[in-house]
Amino acid sequence: MATTSIAWQQTASRVQQFYRLTKPRVVSLIVFTAVIGMFLSVPGVVPLDTLIFATVGIAFVAGAAAAVNCLVEQKIDAVMARTRGRPLPRGTVTSPETFVFLALVGGAGLLILHQLVNPLTMWLTLGTFVGYAIIYTVILKPMTPQNIVIGGASGAMPPVLGWAAVTGEVSADALLLFLIIFAWTPPHFWALALYRKLEYAKVGMPMLPVTHGDKFTRLHVLLYTLILIAVTLMPYATQMSGLIYLAGAIVLDVIFLYYAVKIYLNYSDQLARSAFRYSILYLAGLFAVLLVDHYIRF
């Protein structure tokens, strides 16, 4: 009995380590925006089978992309305080195990999307995987301080994937959702990079605060926040959304702008940390308001 219990605990621990490779908190936001994209794509209810299979498929491929990131950056992760507890730096899983895991999970996700959703969603998701795992992680991130701006395109794709899963096409409204996340990505990550600047410098990662300094980065956090605010007003301007969304977006935008102005004028690491955390709530809140407005329109 005791032997069985120990074996079960060891198995559960191993499963947990592989689960951590998928960066579940990051993937949960990806899946959330993808699901919102599904609901926004139709006036009524999303077919249950499409909702389930698309969600699972997108989550699997996103998790595989996160595992690629962990695999490629394991030496960097071992140095940085924020990431040294991940499974690969700790040695709780090996590189070959990670590769097999991500291949199986990613392959399963693509198969689900192709066979049970539609080929367009599968190809768009594969393109997103390549954009994040290869173009961003392997090429852009260690090469240019504009990694977040250029690589942000892959991170902005989830609502487009959700939209395509339900409709089989990509519309202008879907691309507007893409633009929101694309504009959100730089101020979100640069807030993190500001208070983690020394760690990024230590591992030679050319994040904007490392290459161009704090003041330049703080200015760009503010500028990109203003761009983000302009983009978030577009769903109302194009009549994609109504007054509920407009009111919610304005409230969320004002708070984000407050953080951006404070970061520019009176910077502290704690302020940047708070701004980074708020930016996650901001994006989730913005898409939640989009969903509410979609079904309750004024």
Swiss-Prot record:
GO terms for cellular component: plasma membrane. It is a multi-pass membrane protein. It catalyses: heme b + (2E,6E)-farnesyl diphosphate + H2O = Fe(II)-heme o + diphosphate. GO terms for biological process: heme O biosynthetic process. Its EC number is 2.5.1.141. Keywords: Cell inner membrane, Cell membrane, Heme biosynthesis, Membrane, Transferase, Transmembrane, Transmembrane helix. InterPro entries: Protohaem_IX_farnesylTrfase, UbiA_prenyltransferase, UbiA_prenylTrfase_CS, UbiA_sf. Its main location: membrane. GO terms for molecular function: protoheme IX farnesyltransferase activity. Pathway: Porphyrin-containing compound metabolism; heme O biosynthesis; heme O from protoheme: step 1/1. Converts heme B (protoheme IX) to heme O by substitution of the vinyl group on carbon 2 of heme B porphyrin ring with a hydroxyethyl farnesyl side group. Carbon 2 of the heme B porphyrin ring is defined according to the Fischer nomenclature. NCBIfam families: cyoE_ctaB, PRK04375.1-2. HAMAP family: CyoE_CtaB. This is Protoheme IX farnesyltransferase. It comes from Nitrosospira multiformis (strain ATCC 25196 / NCIMB 11849 / C 71).
